[in-house]
Amino acid sequence: MGFCRSALHPLSLLVQAIMLAMTLALGTLPAFLPCELQPHGLVNCNWLFLKSVPHFSMAAPRGNVTSLSLSSNRIHHLHDSDFAHLPSLRHLNLKWNCPPVGLSPMHFPCHMTIEPSTFLAVPTLEELNLSYNNIMTVPALPKSLISLSLSHTNILMLDSASLAGLHALRFLFMDGNCYYKNPCRQALEVAPGALLGLGNLTHLSLKYNNLTVVPRNLPSSLEYLLLSYNRIVKLAPEDLANLTALRVLDVGGNCRRCDHAPNPCMECPRHFPQLHPDTFSHLSRLEGLVLKDSSLSWLNASWFRGLGNLRVLDLSENFLYKCITKTKAFQGLTQLRKLNLSFNYQKRVSFAHLSLAPSFGSLVALKELDMHGIFFRSLDETTLRPLARLPMLQTLRLQMNFINQAQLGIFRAFPGLRYVDLSDNRISGASELTATMGEADGGEKVWLQPGDLAPAPVDTPSSEDFRPNCSTLNFTLDLSRNNLVTVQPEMFAQLSHLQCLRLSHNCISQAVNGSQFLPLTGLQVLDLSHNKLDLYHEHSFTELPRLEALDLSYNSQPFGMQGVGHNFSFVAHLRTLRHLSLAHNNIHSQVSQQLCSTSLRALDFSGNALGHMWAEGDLYLHFFQGLSGLIWLDLSQNRLHTLLPQTLRNLPKSLQVLRLRDNYLAFFKWWSLHFLPKLEVLDLAGNQLKALTNGSLPAGTRLRRLDVSCNSISFVAPGFFSKAKELRELNLSANALKTVDHSWFGPLASALQILDVSANPLHCACGAAFMDFLLEVQAAVPGLPSRVKCGSPGQLQGLSIFAQDLRLCLDEALSWDCFALSLLAVALGLGVPMLHHLCGWDLWYCFHLCLAWLPWRGRQSGRDEDALPYDAFVVFDKTQSAVADWVYNELRGQLEECRGRWALRLCLEERDWLPGKTLFENLWASVYGSRKTLFVLAHTDRVSGLLRASFLLAQQRLLEDRKDVVVLVILSPDGRRSRYVRLRQRLCRQSVLLWPHQPSGQRSFWAQLGMALTRDNHHFYNRNFCQGPTAE
């Protein structure tokens, strides 16, 4: 026995060595399975549902790993040796592995255990993120740590021992350890001097921790201190003592304004907050101060004394609606760049007018002013007069103020203004404002309803990625989501320098004729999406000589009016137009037969009905041919079922990008791409392609990117991509591919930069050919270890293709099949000769004797004799056109054409009755020559003529042959009221079928009807009432 063991051990070692050699010869697996190696030494293990830290193989270049991300897994225990094998690790992300109960999506209890030397074993670690984990104490940390995040944990105590020795620490984040989503019975406790030993700490964030005082003895090196949304309602100079290096201080949300709170809120106590006049006076280096949501109703000028370097001041969500008309607190803030005063409204009040305090004029360095949500109804030159003298003001936000009267010409007086946002107001047109309107501190007030304070709707998807970005232009005016019904030239008087105008989401329903924008001679970008424009005039928009981008998307209402024509000839007159969007207008007919432009480079025509237009013969076949310089064309969501070669032939030859996403294309003539010699990008995602056949990509094509994702592709012809020598990016994701073959690509495979095959049901059989190919091009396959998954066999479904090495695995099913076949062959080889020799004649006699007694043998001859020419005789009232149409188009098609080899033979009066015979002879032959008689009825209350005669013959057959051959199909819901129908439903329910009026039920109806016509009604009778007719 010992000898056998000693002999087998070297043999097993030899087998293992051979297997290892085969593995190395077949190709190299991804180094960091199941994770993915990304640029700059990052190993990404996010969202892999890991329960432990993966230990990578010795062959992996572990020394090159500088960042490891294990976010959003299920790791509950960290061992001492988990990261010791990564000697160069600098960044480690472990967030969202074991969240506290309140933050868990399913509120499951969880606790993370960290062994003492887990992080000490990584002496190079610089950044550690333990946020969103249920840990109670700060673990032991290496001295090399620079950034530490312990936010949204259950750590409620910080003392000098917690962070001892972390002299290199510069960033410490401990937000959300005690608040309404992560509740606790106490506040975060920071012992005095607990952080004093962190001599290099520059960033400290303690937001959402129920703190009532500023932690004492903070390190003097702090530059950023974030204490917002705690309960600190008193601030004095000693609270921020020694923090002379502070650059950013956030103490907002500590004494909240609850009428505007989007989450649970505690009202600020009366006569609070209390800020000492000298609270910030010693912070001479302060650049950013946040006092938002602090229930401030006035500003003390001494608060800002000594803050000569202040650049950003956030005073939003307070009660400063009157203060900003009188305050002198801004006089010394000469370096202020950004000021936020949004949502400083008086509860339930809208002021008639607002005049800013003269002290705003001293903000000579101000670049951005946010004043949305203050609620005043008129805007004129007196409103913003102090701002007109500010040379550096670039951005002014005035949205959501209920402004209904606005003099837009006042912005000409602002020398450096680049962006004005007046969206989400109630501006309805040009207005003449008087100078006697009420002021914010004592004028006319309108009480608001609660619904008026609802947030603005989120923008729907538009052509933002299509048109040029207005941020690069000199002056932009946003008037979207107002109450504009018409556009008048007077609105834009003195705005000739305006370059970008947004008028989307209004109610503009006029016919533009070339006079609406006359003053805007410098306009380059015009957004008129989500309106109701009538494009009828030939000279629309021709008053804009510099217009480059025009967005007319989502103006579908005029195009839906029957009989009204629409004129696109204005496009030819816009000599500088380069970008045009006509998307989502449901354009389908009665428009210009051709678009013409020599300057247009990009056209968005998605969301229309081009499939209907091209179905109208040659009327719109040349619709895009006049766009001689077009480069980018989007025809997505145009209900295209086919794309014929002559259609591509009539597209502009200059096209480089063609998008055909989300149509109904089931096939594509790939050879027709040679009609577009400059095409580089083709997007066919979201169609109904079943296979990539019909030839291959043509030779000489310049196609660089092809997207056929989200189709139903299950087959690709060999060599399909091989002729496209310049193809570099190919997206085959979300299809029905079971393999990926090297023969599809040929020599092109090595040149691919992106090959996306994720979300395909790959068949992970042993020796799968696609494994070797994907390993060859693994650098081009995004998410290869985690996103490329098996679809079959069942035990590997949904798992990574690397769940086991498919090149070396043993196919158990095949092994069992081979064993069974070999066993059967041996048994037959031994048994058959032996039985033949011993009792051959007896076996032959018994075989034929049993064969003669088999039941089906006796029935076969009778069945041939009783064979009938038809399976069913269909009887219906021909005078009812709807019933006749249903029979000929629906019933006949489903039973004779759609059932394949199981098709039924129907007898129809107008098709199968023999001429020359009498009506009764044909009727008799049809009833007695069919297995069933099918009555199709719209109503059952009045049955006569052929229907009545056929029913009487069927009943006669019941009496003579004792065979019930009646099957009823009732098309109207009222038909079931007949007493006969109700009685028959009770006795033989499956022979009475009701046509479903919901499409979802029609498939079941045809299945039930097929069963009723192929089986004897005797089997359908309810045995509780009767046994049904039986033959004697």
Swiss-Prot record:
- Residues with covalent lipid (S-palmitoyl cysteine) sit at 258, 265
> What protein does this entry describe?
Toll-like receptor 9
Which gene is transcribed and translated to give this protein?
Answer: TLR9
> Domain named TIR: which ranges?
868-1013
Protein's UniProt keywords contain NAD: no
Can you name the source organism? Answer: Homo sapiens
- Chief subcellular location: endoplasmic reticulum
Q: Which Gene3D superfamilies match?
A: Ribonuclease Inhibitor, Toll/interleukin-1 receptor homology (TIR) domain
Q: Name one GO cellular component term.
A: basolateral plasma membrane
Please give the residue ranges for the topological domain Extracellular.
Answer: 26-818
Q: TM segments?
A: 819-839
What is the membrane topology here? Answer: Single-pass type I membrane protein
User: Which residues does UniProt assign to the signal peptide?
Assistant: 1-25
Which terms in the Gene Ontology molecular function aspect does this entry carry? interleukin-1 receptor binding; pattern recognition receptor activity; protein homodimerization activity; siRNA binding; unmethylated CpG binding
Quaternary structure (record): Monomer and homodimer. Exists as a monomer in the absence of unmethylated cytidine-phosphate-guanosine (CpG) ligand. Proteolytic processing of an insertion loop (Z-loop) is required for homodimerization upon binding to the unmethylated CpG ligand leading to its activation. Interacts with MYD88 via their respective TIR domains. Interacts with BTK. Interacts (via transmembrane domain) with UNC93B1. Interacts with CD300LH; the interaction may promote full activation of TLR9-triggered innate responses.
What residues bind DNA, as annotated?
47-51, 72-77, 95-109, 132, 179-181, 208
GO aspect biological process, one term: cellular response to lipopolysaccharide
Residues bearing carbohydrate: 64, 129, 200, 210, 242, 300, 340, 469, 474, 513, 567, 694, 731
Protein's job? Key component of innate and adaptive immunity. TLRs (Toll-like receptors) control host immune response against pathogens through recognition of molecular patterns specific to microorganisms. TLR9 is a nucleotide-sensing TLR which is activated by unmethylated cytidine-phosphate-guanosine (CpG) dinucleotides. Acts via MYD88 and TRAF6, leading to NF-kappa-B activation, cytokine secretion and the inflammatory response. Controls lymphocyte response to Helicobacter infection. Upon CpG stimulation, induces B-cell proliferation, activation, survival and antibody production.
Write out the ranges of the repeats annotated as LRR.
62-85, 87-110, 122-147, 150-166, 167-190, 198-221, 223-242, 243-268, 283-306, 308-332, 333-356, 363-386, 390-413, 415-440, 470-494, 496-519, 520-543, 545-572, 574-598, 600-622, 627-650, 652-675, 676-699, 701-723, 724-747, 749-772
Q: Which family does it belong to?
A: Belongs to the Toll-like receptor family.
Q: Does the keyword Protein transport apply?
A: no
Q: Which UniProt keywords apply?
A: Cytoplasmic vesicle, Disulfide bond, Endoplasmic reticulum, Endosome, Glycoprotein, Golgi apparatus, Immunity, Inflammatory response, Innate immunity, Leucine-rich repeat, Lipoprotein, Lysosome, Membrane, Palmitate, Receptor, Repeat, Signal, Transmembrane, Transmembrane helix
Q: Which residues lie on this side of the membrane: Cytoplasmic?
A: 840-1032
Cysteine-cysteine disulfides: 35-45, 98-110, 178-184, 255-268, 258-265, 470-500, 764-790, 766-809
Q: Which PROSITE patterns match?
A: LRR, TIR
